[in-house]
């Protein structure tokens, strides 16, 4: 029996809708995201293989209304279950202080998922036949909106306000026929909604708003250094913290000092790719996100379900890092494939296409499985590093595969340091330097140099760590230990005075310990 034309995409939609909401799987060093990425890649690869089989059987028209409706339905269903789980957690444990997360890692991730899926639910609500289905989709939309509010995500609230404006326009246009009254009610409501949203977003977390402004300013300095070609792959990770350190050296009394932390992303996707790859990258990203709108304006009304979802990614890209999560890439991929479906249909006519598709699918499967095995080996080595010297042999075996991964190198150096293999730790942490300039790397490098009695280098690393994050106490403790070991009483007293008078951001047990020790 020939394969049903829509089967590959229906399989992918069902698979992805479940994978995106997976709880943490503790088989890798990143229990939240890595399992989702691996399962998503495997889902795409298997879909490609199924599509190749469909082509071999002469089934070429994959895109149809049934597939689109199925995609919206399965994502609406899984999102509704996720929202119900959030409700269950609230009933059992009460409201979460930092915002609801459900089965995901943080409120921002949950809000992104809800904002992407809400337009799909709305599309089903508008196009469904039958009162019972409309009630079901309406209930799912209301539940998603309530949970989105409970995430306390400011970007999510902006998207929710956007949905409110669009929904209000649909209601006003349908039920109010007098043009002047219609525009009056709509205009006043929109102004009030926008003013309320702006006030909430601006004043809800003032420290966070100030911190974002500071990060954007330092990131823009990186852009101005190499606006055309950028700083290269992962240039932001290499360069940003150095600029932050330079700023606080020049402005030690800055109001931002108490807010500074380890930064690995500027909280703006356009700025991030610009720093790394130059001006062409943000332009390409913007055009990609606007592709459904361009197709819709050219008369392709079948792009309607993707307009708001891609707009959501555009909004999140201005304030967060949505492409850190599989749901963003999935949304872009489906939107782009649907936008170029006619071109894709022409490619399907070529006999070589299913062979290329099958080879590509098998390659993705092989790559994903190989990477997952190595990542699991890293997880095992990390777990063993707390109690077994054999962990260093495991790290050594994994080193050729991960030698360009700065997170692995830091983990390897930390494991070597904990097992008291200082020479190995020093070599590895130095290899990490050209790939990543960060507070934690400098602090670990300082500790390694201190125990190797390389005191001048230890001072350099501790001072760099202190400049990167002036609010932290650990670098000052490191400097205190160095000056104590070298008998430098003058600098020892200066550091002790700094620790005694330093503003405490979070009064943790470590801070209290450092204050007691360094009196």
Specify the residue positions occupied by each region the protein language model found.
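Alpha-helical transmembrane segments of multi-pass inner-membrane proteins
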Residues: 10-29, 36, 40-60, 66-97, ...
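Interfacial juxtamembrane loops and adjacent helix segments
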Residues: 233-276
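Hydrophobic alpha-helical transmembrane segments in integral membrane proteins
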Residues: 197-211, 359-390, 407
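Alpha-solenoid helical repeat scaffolds
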Residues: 376, 407-411, 440-445, 473-478, ...
């Amino acid at each position: 029996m020939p394969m049903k034309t829509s089967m590959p995409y229906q399989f992918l939609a069902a698979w992805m809708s479940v994978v995106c909401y997976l709880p943490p799987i503790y088989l890798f060093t990143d229990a939240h995201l890595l399992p989702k990425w691996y399962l998503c890649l495997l889902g795409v690869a298997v879909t490609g293989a199924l599509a190749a089989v469909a082509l071999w059987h002469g089934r070429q028209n994959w895109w149809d209304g049934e597939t689109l409706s199925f995609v919206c339905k399965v994502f609406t269903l899984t999102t509704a279950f996720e929202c119900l789980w959030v409700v269950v957690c609230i009933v059992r444990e009460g409201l979460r202080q930092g915002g609801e997360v459900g089965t995901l890692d943080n409120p921002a991730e949950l809000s992104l998922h809800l904002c992407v899926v809400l337009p799909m639910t709305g599309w089903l609500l508008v196009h469904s036949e039958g009162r019972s289905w409309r009630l079901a989709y309406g209930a799912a939309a209301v539940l998603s909106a309530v949970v989105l509010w409970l995430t306390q995500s400011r970007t999510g609230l902006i998207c929710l306000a956007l949905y409110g404006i669009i929904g209000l326009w649909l209601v006003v246009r349908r039920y109010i026929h007098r043009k002047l009254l219609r525009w009056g009610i709509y205009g006043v409501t929109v102004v009030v909604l926008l003013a309320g949203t702006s006030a909430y977003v601006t004043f809800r977390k003032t420290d966070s708003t100030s911190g974002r402004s500071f990060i954007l300013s330092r990131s823009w300095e990186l852009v101005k250094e190499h606006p055309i070609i950028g700083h290269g792959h992962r240039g932001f990770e290499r360069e940003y913290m150095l600029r932050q350190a330079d700023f606080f050296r020049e402005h030690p009394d800055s109001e931002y000092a108490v807010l500074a932390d380890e930064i690995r992303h500027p909280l703006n996707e356009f700025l991030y790719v610009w720093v790394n790859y130059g001006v062409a990258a943000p332009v390409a990203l913007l055009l990609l996100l606007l592709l459904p709108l361009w197709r819709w304006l050219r008369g392709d009304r079948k792009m309607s379900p993707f307009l708001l979802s891609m707009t959501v990614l555009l909004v999140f890209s201005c304030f967060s890092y949505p492409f850190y999560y599989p749901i963003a890439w999935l949304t872009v991929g489906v939107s782009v494939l649907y936008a170029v479906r006619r071109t894709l249909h022409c490619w399907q006519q070529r006999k070589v296409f299913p062979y290329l598709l099958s080879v590509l699918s098998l390659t993705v499967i092989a790559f994903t499985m190989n990477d997952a095995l190595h990542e699991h080996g890293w997880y095992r080595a990390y777990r063993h590093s707390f109690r077994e010297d054999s962990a260093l042999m495991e790290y050594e075996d994994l080193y050729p595969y991960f030698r360009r991964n700065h997170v692995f190198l830091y983990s390897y150096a930390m494991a070597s340091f904990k097992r008291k293999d200082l020479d190995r730790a020093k070599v590895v942490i130095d290899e990490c330097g050209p790939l990543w300039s960060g507070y934690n790397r400098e602090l670990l490098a300082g500790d390694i140099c201190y125990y190797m009695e390389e005191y001048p280098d230890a001072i350099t690393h501790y001072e760099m760590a202190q400049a990167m994050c002036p609010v932290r106490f650990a670098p000052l403790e490191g400097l205190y230990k160095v000056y104590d070991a070298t008998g430098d009483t003058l600098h020892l007293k200066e550091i002790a005075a700094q620790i005694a008078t330093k503003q405490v951001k979070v009064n943790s047990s470590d801070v209290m310990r450092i204050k007691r020790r360094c009196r």
